[in-house]
């Protein structure tokens, strides 16, 4: 018997809707199930997508309650509170989102205990850690989108700089999805040729130019938010990429947020390292052979993430 491929999305704001559109347009699943506290919003998004069904094929989309997620193989968590006022602290916002996620995890452990969870709400690394702490499912089955988007931005900018298809660029940003993230220059390559300190495709390595490229990738969200008020399109594609890797058991190596479990001397935190992603979620970790400087920067990133949740309290 052929099993229907079912994807759930909890939270139909800008990011959840962009993810639904990306998956719908790519026909990644048999059905996409949308759930939101604002049920009419979820219904409206499902209706809007279904009006394009004839153009993409037999995929269906509908608004549901938690019980309907029982057959979902993978569920995206894109719900979250927005800042209530300019005076609200980052910790205050994080505290409210942590409480929202606690309620979500209670429902998902009850109705969809076997589903892979993909966390997309920011701060994604801290919320991925919270989900792993609260959920009864194995940690490997809870991933965060992490630095996959940062890495995509990084490769796109490097591809533009060197005049090649970004898919021919192999370079990672690891660690926190945020200010402490780390560019991995030591093994960044184009066509197998290392970039750092080398002349590639007629372009010499210039430290200042490369630092600028990294900073553009790291700070891209701020620039986009300044212009359009939010980010959604690219992160929607990133979520679809992870969903495809899981549903099709692709065994892709992707920088997603998970627990290093002692790798690089890091524990008790979620951050992005290269992982093999397949049907079971995070199936293996890959050690890309970081330089001593990069390893220390990754440990600094882990410390920053631990500090960010130091005063957080989440009931169980």
Curated annotation (Swiss-Prot):
Family annotation (Pfam families): Ldh_1_C, Ldh_1_N
Domain of life: Bacteria
Active-site residues, record numbering mapped to chain: 177
Single Gene Ontology BP annotation: glycolytic process
Parts of the chain that traverse the membrane: none
Known pathway: Fermentation; pyruvate fermentation to lactate; (S)-lactate from pyruvate: step 1/1
GO MF assignments: L-lactate dehydrogenase activity
UniProt xrefs under Gene3D superfamilies: Lactate dehydrogenase/glycoside hydrolase, family 4, C-terminal, NAD(P)-binding Rossmann-like Domain
Protein name (Swiss-Prot/TrEMBL): L-lactate dehydrogenase
Species assigned in the record: Salinibacter ruber (strain DSM 13855 / M31)
């Amino acid at each position: 018997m052929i099993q229907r491929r079912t994807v759930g999305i909890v939270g139909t704001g800008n990011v959840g809707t962009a993810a639904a559109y990306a998956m719908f347009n790519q026909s990644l699943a048999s059905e996409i199930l949308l759930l939101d506290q604002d049920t009419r919003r979820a219904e409206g998004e499902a209706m809007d997508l279904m009006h394009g069904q004839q153009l993409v094929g037999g995929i269906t989309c509908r608004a549901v309650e938690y019980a309907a997620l029982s057959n979902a193989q993978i569920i995206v968590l894109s719900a979250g509170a927005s800042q209530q006022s300019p005076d609200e602290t980052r910790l205050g916002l994080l505290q409210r989102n942590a409480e929202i996620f606690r309620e979500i995890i209670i429902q998902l452990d009850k109705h969809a205990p076997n589903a892979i969870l993909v966390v997309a709400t920011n701060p994604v690394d801290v919320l991925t850690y919270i989900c792993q702490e609260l959920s009864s499912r194995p940690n490997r089955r809870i991933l965060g989108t992490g630095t996959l988007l940062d890495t995509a931005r990084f490769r796109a900018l490097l591809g533009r700089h060197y005049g090649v298809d970004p898919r021919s660029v192999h370079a990672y940003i690891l660690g926190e999805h945020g200010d402490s993230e780390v560019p991995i220059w030591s093994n960044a390559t184009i066509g197998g040729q290392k970039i750092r300190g080398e002349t590639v495709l007629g372009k010499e390595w210039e430290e200042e130019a490369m630092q600028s490229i990294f900073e553009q990738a790291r700070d891209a969200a701020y620039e986009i938010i300044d212009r359009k008020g939010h980010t959604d399109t690219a992160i929607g594609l990133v979520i679809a990429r992870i969903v495809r890797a899981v549903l099709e058991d692709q065994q892709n190596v992707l920088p997603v947020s998970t627990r290093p479990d002692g790798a690089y001397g890091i524990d008790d935190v979620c951050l992005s390292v290269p992982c093999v992603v397949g049907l079971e979620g995070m199936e293996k970790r890959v050690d890309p052979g970081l330089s001593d400087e990069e390893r220390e920067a990754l440990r600094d990133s882990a410390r920053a993430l631990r500090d960010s949740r130091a005063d957080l309290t989440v009931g169980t």
